Amino acid sequence: MPVVTRLMSFLGDRWQEEQRDAALFHEFDCPGPVQAGRVSRCSCPCPAQILDRVATDRRIVRDCEQRIRREQDRGLCWSVESVRAFQVMKAFALPYELHPGWQESWRP
């Protein structure tokens, strides 16, 4: 399923960018150090929230991808559950629709 693979790759790249950029929200008066653009165990709420959200999004989309792959391996091609899982994946991609790598076929 190349469309699922392309969408997963697109989402992974966007989330990697968000993880990297989370350090930009590090507060100046926080005693925790920022090293090489990464937030390392500080008490700033914003970077932690960004990183937690990205981790949760990754977990949900990974579960959706596994469901699609599992059903495909069993010979079920785009069952109702797979279609629903793919719609969830496309919904996670929607906030990035202005990115040059966005594909219109990903619109939920």
What positions do the PLM features span?
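Aromatic-glycine hotspot motif
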Residues: 1-35, 54, 58
